[in-house]
């Protein structure tokens, strides 16, 4: 019997020995197979060399140089084709690139492109002919320094402009996968690029492509979604129907028409709207959309257009590819499918650049590479079902990341559908609800998504990666999608540019895609049609700007409402328990009578960038000076248009102290007929008065009286005042601490028709029924600080930083579901949702800011078009 010791030591040794022998045998077997294959390959090559090759002999009927094989048309039928016939004579005609085997090939008429010795002369070379067959350095391998000098061949008086869109290329892809997209990364390195391009809302394909080429928001150009209904047309638009080819849907003027109207020629190889007779006109050269056309064919055709004679050659080109959007939808943004798609579009872009280099056009063409939107992951367990909120669903819903709800019964019930009830029934229903319902006029102004009959009244803003759908029958989930709030990082798109007009090796701040249209017009040296962009705001991308902006001209001049009498002729129903005698009143009223030195001092401190100019006609505003704030008063509206003041960095972030209670008095500088009455209220609407400039923001106990006056009153809903007061007493202190002081300009907004522009006086009067004081639709706040936070706002010598808000003035705070919550849990978030650009504030108020800031206007426009974002997660 074996011992235990033998079992535990000898048996493993035997097993290891056997294992070694097995490995050695396998290795020897592999070597034997390899040697056999090598011998066979050598024998085969010798046989092939003896037999002959089809190189330069494709479809030649003669037998010269061929032994035992043929390369003519009939060789397949006879079975005597040379060994390389298929590769050389058949497959080479089906690819769009050269290789060493194709170089010097016999010209074949069936080839997609040629690598023959005469292809340059015949202008049908494959795009990479010179780099593959003539040994030139490929574009992607060239150093940026070799492409610095602008140069155009003879006949190119105006540098051509190419607009290239890669659908769904989110900005993060280029950061994460830069090594997998060498051609695109080369463009980024050598040219100018933004951190990202902000799409318009909804972040969908058709709305954003048309925004890019018109400079208009979707609400302005009419393509508000990929799917929509128009009550006036009584028709539905979708990407799968022929109705999308109806010009009635396409409003505004796309860049190809702008160029053609001004004598230029254009060529479009796919772009939403380019195969539609918009305004009765097609582009000079265009292709009807067909997604089956290979990307290589699209590039080759565009390059052939560049080869046309000067009289026929387009000046402007568009080209579009569907990836990486398609793979993003199929597999999600973080997937092998997207990586493969990125490599495909990079190879496609590389072909374009090789073709341009081959034509000596790399430093002649201005090329913009961008995307329409980004992409986010979706999950089938992240769906909000309307069936969970309604016992029965008797409405129609556009489902997904940008949902809208309307009546089923169209057109009969389109205008009578109770949208308000739908929003009420969807508001604050669950503690973990993943969407917020809005009536379109109440949506954040930064979205510019309200003023179009095609925009349904009920809109849901959905959390990232979630979708809102009708019921559990919905199955479009689990891959990727887009359409979300355009502030989400996952929706950010790419923007890169290169060419003789663009700066090199430059990164710029993000900007909105509405600005691209004006940029294209500048590159083409043409006048843009009216649009939502801010012309000149992208001048910093260009070496030599074509257009130099100037400040808007003031249309209504401010006078000064001066101090004339120390006591009011009419108390306007005001009273103050602390000011019982006329001498008390006179004492505080005398504080309103500033000397010229005091006016100069308050202007320097509280209007450090100059007072806002009024770009409204037929107004009679006046300036009201105080030591701690300055306001521009509108006598017709009986309220300030704006108030401006500077909050210094505080010693701590404690909330501001309360002010004297129940204390108001008439402003003696404003006529009673032009003032609000202290007793003004609309009890049925729960409206009372609030203060535009916060009285608690006082440096001395007496200075609060400068704010407790009728000229500082604005009408406010009680619920809104809760939020307004918290902002000024808590958040403003916090911002001043973080930014080393802030300048604040705030005021009312009147946009009853929700078109994003200030209402004319007669429009305001139409809505101000049964009240002498019109009720604002929104209030704005613009916070300005110094980007260099070692400097205060009133002493800032460099760039400014801005944080603007446009807050809907609503009777409730249901948007934030504040019940049983302290203001600290919802007010700041509410303000952040309603951030805006300074330019949005200007359009809504008719004001123009920063006219006295010592800085080029184009740089001021960069500031005005900046949109603060608070999203950090992708």
From Swiss-Prot:
Positions annotated as glycosylated: 236, 279, 290, 425, 532, 677, 686, 698, 770, 788, 820
Coiled coil regions, renumbered to chain: none
Active site: 205
InterPro entries attached to this UniProt entry: Alkaline_phosphatase_core_sf, DNA/RNA_non-sp_Endonuclease_sf, Endo_G_ENPP1-like_dom, ENPP1-3/EXOG-like_nuc-like, His-Me_finger_sf, Phosphodiest/P_Trfase, Somatomedin_B-like_dom_sf, Somatomedin_B_dom
GO BP terms: ATP metabolic process; basophil activation involved in immune response; negative regulation of inflammatory response; negative regulation of mast cell activation involved in immune response; negative regulation of mast cell proliferation; nucleoside triphosphate catabolic process; phosphate ion homeostasis; pyrimidine nucleotide metabolic process
Spans traversing the lipid bilayer: 12-30
Cofactor note: Binds 2 zinc ions per subunit.
Molecular functions (GO terms): ATP binding; ATP diphosphatase activity; bis(5'-adenosyl)-pentaphosphatase activity; bis(5'-adenosyl)-triphosphatase activity; bis(5'-nucleosyl)-tetraphosphatase (asymmetrical) activity; calcium ion binding; GTP diphosphatase activity; nucleic acid binding
Major enzyme class: hydrolase
Gene behind this protein: ENPP3
Disulfide bonds listed in the record: 54-71, 58-89, 69-82, 75-81, 98-115, 103-133, 113-126, 119-125, 144-190, 152-364, 380-477, 428-817, 561-622, 574-678, 576-663, 786-796
One Pfam family of this chain: Phosphodiest
Domain SMB: 50-93, 94-138
Region (Phosphodiesterase): 160-544
Region (Nuclease): 581-874
Annotated Zn(2+) 1 binding sites: 167, 205, 372-373
Record's bilayer topology term: Single-pass type II membrane protein
Catalytic reaction equation(s): a ribonucleoside 5'-triphosphate + H2O = a ribonucleoside 5'-phosphate + diphosphate + H(+); ATP + H2O = AMP + diphosphate + H(+); CTP + H2O = CMP + diphosphate + H(+); GTP + H2O = GMP + diphosphate + H(+)
Membrane-side (Extracellular) residue stretches: 31-874
Entry protein name: Ectonucleotide pyrophosphatase/phosphodiesterase family member 3
Species of the source: Bos taurus
E.C. number(s) listed in UniProt: 3.1.4.1, 3.6.1.-, 3.6.1.9
GO cellular component, one term: apical plasma membrane
């Amino acid at each position: 019997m074996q011992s235990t010791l033998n079992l535990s030591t000898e048996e493993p040794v035997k097993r290891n020995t056997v294992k070694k022998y097995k490995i050695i045998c396998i290795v020897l077997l592999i070597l034997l197979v390899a040697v056999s294959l090598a011998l066979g390959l050598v024998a085969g090559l010798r046989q092939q060399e003896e037999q002959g090759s089809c190189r330069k002999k494709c479809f030649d009927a003669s037998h010269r140089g061929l032994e035992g094989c043929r390369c003519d048309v009939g060789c397949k039928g006879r079975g005597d084709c040379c060994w390389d016939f298929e590769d050389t004579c058949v497959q080479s005609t089906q690819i769009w690139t050269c290789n060493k085997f194709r170089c010097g090939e016999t010209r074949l008429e069936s080839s997609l492109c040629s690598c023959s010795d005469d292809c340059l002369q015949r202008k049908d070379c494959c795009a990479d002919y010179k780099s593959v067959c003539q040994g030139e350095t490929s574009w992607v391998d060239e150093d940026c320094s070799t492409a610095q000098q602008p140069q155009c061949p003879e006949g190119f008086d105006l540098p051509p402009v190419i607009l290239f869109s890669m659908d769904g290329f989110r900005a993060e892809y280029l950061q994460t996968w830069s090594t997998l997209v060498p051609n695109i990364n080369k463009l980024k390195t050598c040219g100018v690029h933004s951190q990202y391009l902000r799409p318009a809302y909804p972040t969908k394909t058709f709305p954003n492509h048309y925004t890019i080429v018109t400079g208009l928001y979707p609400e302005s150009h009419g393509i508000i979604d990929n799917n929509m209904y128009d009550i006036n047309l009584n028709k539905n638009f979708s990407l799968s129907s022929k109705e999308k080819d109806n010009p009635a849907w396409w409003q505004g003027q796309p860049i190809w028409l702008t160029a053609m109207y001004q004598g230029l020629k254009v060529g479009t190889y796919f772009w939403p709207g380019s195969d539609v007779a918009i305004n009765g006109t097609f582009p000079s050269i265009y292709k009807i959309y067909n997604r089956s056309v290979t990307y290589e064919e699209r590039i080759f055709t565009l390059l052939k257009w560049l080869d046309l004679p000067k009289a026929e050659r387009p000046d402007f080109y568009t080209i579009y590819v569907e990836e990486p959007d398609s793979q993003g939808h199929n597999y999600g943004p973080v997937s092998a499918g997207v990586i493969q798609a990125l490599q495909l579009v990079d190879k496609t872009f590389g072909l374009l650049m090789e073709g341009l280099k081959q034509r000596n056009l790399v430093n002649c063409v201005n090329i913009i590479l961008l995307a329409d939107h980004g992409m986010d992951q979706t999950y089938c367990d992240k769906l909000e079902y309307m069936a969970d909120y309604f016992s029965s669903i008797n409405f129609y819903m556009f489902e997904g990341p940008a949902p809208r709800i309307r009546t089923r019964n169209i057109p009969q019930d389109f205008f009578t559908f109770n949208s308000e009830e739908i929003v009420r029934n969807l508001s604050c229903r669950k503690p973990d609800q993943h969407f917020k319902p809005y009536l379109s006029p109440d949506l954040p102004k930064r979205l510019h998504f309200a003023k179009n009959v095609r925009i349904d009244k009920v809109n849901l803003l959905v959390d990232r990666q979630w979708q809102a759908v009708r019921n559990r029958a919905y199955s479009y989930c689990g891959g990727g999608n887009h359409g979300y709030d355009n502030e989400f990082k996952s929706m950010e798109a790419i923007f890169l540019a290169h060419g003789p007009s663009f700066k090199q090796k430059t990164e710029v701040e993000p900007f909105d895609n509405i600005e691209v249209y004006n940029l294209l017009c500048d590159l083409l040296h043409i006048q843009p049609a009216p649009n939502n962009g801010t012309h000149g705001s992208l001048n910093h991308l260009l070496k030599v700007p074509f257009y130099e902006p100037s400040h808007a001209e003031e249309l209504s001049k401010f006078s000064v409402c001066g101090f004339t009498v120390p006591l009011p002729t009419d108390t306007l129903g005001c009273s103050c328990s602390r000011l019982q005698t006329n001498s008390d009143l006179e004492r505080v009223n005398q504080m309103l009578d500033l000397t010229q030195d005091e006016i100069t001092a308050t202007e320097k401190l509280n209007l450090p960038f100059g007072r806002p100019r009024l770009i409204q006609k037929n107004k009679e505003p006046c300036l009201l000076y105080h030591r701690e704030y300055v306001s521009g008063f509108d006598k017709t509206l009986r309220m300030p248009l704006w108030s401006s003041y500077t909050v210094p960095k505080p010693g701590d972030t404690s909330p501001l102290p309360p002010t004297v209670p129940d204390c108001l008095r008439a402003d003696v500088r404003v006529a009673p007929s032009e003032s609000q009455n202290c007793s003004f209220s609309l009890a049925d609407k729960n409206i009372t008065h609030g203060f535009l400039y916060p009285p608690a923001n006082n440096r001395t106990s007496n200075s609060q009286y400068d704010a407790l006056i009728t000229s500082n009153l604005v009408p406010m809903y009680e619920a809104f005042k809760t939020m307004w007061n918290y902002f000024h007493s808590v958040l403003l202190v916090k911002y001043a601490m973080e930014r080393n002081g802030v300048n604040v300009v705030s005021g009312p907004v009147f946009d009853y028709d929700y078109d994003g522009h200030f209402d004319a006086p007669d429009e305001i009067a139409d809505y101000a029924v049964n009240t002498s004081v019109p009720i604002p639709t929104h209030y704005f706040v613009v916070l300005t600080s110094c980007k260099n936070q070692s400097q205060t706002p009133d002493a800032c010598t460099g760039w400014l930083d801005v944080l603007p808000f446009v807050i809907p003035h609503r009777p409730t705070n249901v948007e934030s579901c504040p019940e049983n919550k302290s203001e600290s849990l919802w007010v700041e978030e509410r303000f952040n949702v309603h951030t805006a650009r300074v330019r949005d504030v200007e359009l809504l108020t008719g004001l123009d800011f920063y006219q006295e800031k010592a800085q080029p206007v184009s740089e001021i426009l960069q500031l005005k078009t900046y949109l603060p974002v608070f999203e950090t997660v992708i």
